[in-house]
């Protein structure tokens, strides 16, 4: 079994195809925008200015650079996520191993000063992404199936230094997203088919649900959304500074294609049971609005000794803006619905940096990701859990212009138990995940 995301469109095809991953932060948020940040568990990112990647987190940091600076790299994710489960009605197994694939998450950053007060920057990252994929005949296919979300964020930002202490930054985000949702009848399909036939429904009407691999829902689409980000930087002196950053909510209004193997004559019966809208394989227009939530973060950096610094962050994401997945047809009918019910969540991180000499810099970090998914809303389509990060990394400077960052993190998610569905459609699950992340970036100052 595997999990994956696939996003291709014109010039974005190569970059987006590389970003194929299960979300390795809370919910379906991605943090992997730099390798130096990976090595410190992304602690202090709104206040550290050791490479151009930090500017994507806090645009006010642009004023910390006195030369045009470039950074490019990728983070490799090697996850291990298993799900064990069974049907509460029949006891049939719903186990799935290694449901998350290995993946690369690339990043590209550039920052340039204009003068002593103004500067600008640009970046290409991915802030949100999710994929769950089970085999077509998976027993709990009505909940598993395929759920793919991929985003690529294009950011352009500028900054202004008011004085020696205060700097302000503002950025514009253009987010390209592509999503796909597929659901299958699973073990519930043949059971429902038998019950309907026993109640006098012609067998021919149940052909769209009578096998586990019957595709009862398929929705896909791609679209652009737009948002903004802002940051403030306060410098007490060259060794102590703090940052406050904000990234706005981005609404993606998908208009795509929908189809279902279910016979439309069964919509009244199966719709009342929560199953998707049937089209008997015919494709029709479908729309879905996805809210990518806003995020606040406060960060600090303190060089407490000539060779030592500490850095820390607390991020707050308004996940309550993501309450449902609801696809509608042209006539306003509900094609597919899933109650998500996320709640706001936080992330805290603490790290330290050791400046060994002019060539070598070493860093470590620890972080805790609070899951936004309430216990009664957990799902195998978004198998989220609280996570602990342990990170380490280094930078080697070849000279005053060129350097390379290497970072590694180990993440462990707590084991969670939950039930999805009711009655004959109820399944009990247990999920646990862990992952290794490795990243490298090349930096160059002109």
Swiss-Prot record:
GO terms for molecular function: long-chain fatty acid transporting porin activity. Involved in translocation of long-chain fatty acids across the outer membrane. FadL may form a specific channel. The keyword Transmembrane applies. Residues 1-25 form the signal peptide. It comes from Escherichia coli O6:H1 (strain CFT073 / ATCC 700928 / UPEC). Belongs to the OmpP1/FadL family. GO terms for cellular component: cell outer membrane. Its main location: membrane. Keywords: Cell outer membrane, Lipid transport, Membrane, Signal, Transmembrane, Transmembrane beta strand, Transport. InterPro entries: OMPP1/FadL/TodX (IPR005017). It is found in: Cell outer membrane. This is Long-chain fatty acid transport protein.
């Amino acid at each position: 079994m595997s999990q994956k995301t696939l996003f291709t469109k014109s010039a974005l095809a190569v970059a987006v195809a590389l970003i194929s991953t299960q979300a390795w932060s809370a919910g379906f948020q991605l943090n992997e925008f730099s390798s130096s940040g990976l090595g410190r568990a992304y602690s202090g990112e709104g206040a550290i200015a050791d490479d151009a990647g930090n500017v994507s987190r806090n645009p006010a940091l642009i004023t910390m650079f006195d030369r045009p600076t470039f950074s490019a790299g990728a983070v490799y994710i090697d996850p291990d996520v298993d799900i064990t489960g069974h049907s509460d009605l029949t006891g049939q197994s719903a186990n799935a191993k290694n449901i998350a694939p290995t993946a690369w998450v690339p990043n590209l950053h550039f920052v340039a000063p204009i003068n002593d007060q103004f500067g600008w920057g640009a970046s290409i990252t991915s802030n949100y992404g999710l994929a769950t994929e089970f085999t077509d005949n998976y027993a709990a296919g009505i909940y598993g199936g395929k759920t793919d979300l991929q985003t690529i964020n294009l950011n352009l930002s500028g900054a202004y230094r008011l004085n020696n202490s205060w700097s302000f930054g503002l950025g514009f985000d253009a987010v390209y997203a592509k999503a796909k949702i597929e659901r299958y009848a699973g073990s519930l399909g043949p059971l429902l088919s038998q019950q309907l036939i026993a109640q006098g429904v012609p067998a021919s009407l149940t052909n769209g649900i009578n096998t586990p691999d019957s595709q009862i829902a398929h929705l896909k689409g791609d679209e652009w959304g737009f948002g903004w980000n802002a940051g403030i930087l306060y410098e007490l002196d060259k060794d102590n500074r703090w940052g406050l950053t904000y990234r706005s909510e981005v609404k993606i209004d998908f208009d795509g294609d929908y189809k279902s193997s279910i016979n439309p004559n069964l919509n009244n019966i199966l719709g009342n049971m929560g199953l998707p809208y049937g089209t008997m394989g015919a494709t029709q227009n479908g729309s879905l609005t996805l809210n990518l939530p806003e995020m606040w973060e406060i960060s600090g950096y303190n060089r407490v000794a000539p060779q030592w610094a500490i850095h820390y962050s607390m991020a707050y994401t308004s996940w309550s803006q993501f309450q449902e997945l609801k696809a509608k047809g042209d006539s306003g009918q509900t094609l597919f619905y899933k109650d998500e019910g996320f709640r706001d969540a936080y992330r805290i991180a603490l790290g330290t940096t050791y400046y060994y000499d002019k060539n070598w810099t070493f860093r470590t970090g620890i972080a805790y990701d609070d899951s936004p998914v309430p216990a009664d809303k957990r799902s195998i389509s978004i198998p989220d859990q609280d996570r602990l990060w342990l990170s380490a990394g280094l930078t080697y400077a070849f000279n005053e212009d060129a350097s390379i960052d290497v970072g590694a993190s180990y993440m462990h998610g707590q084991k969670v138990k939950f039930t999805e569905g009711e009655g004959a459609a109820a399944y009990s699950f247990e999920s646990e995940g862990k992952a290794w992340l490795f990243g490298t970036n090349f930096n160059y100052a002109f």
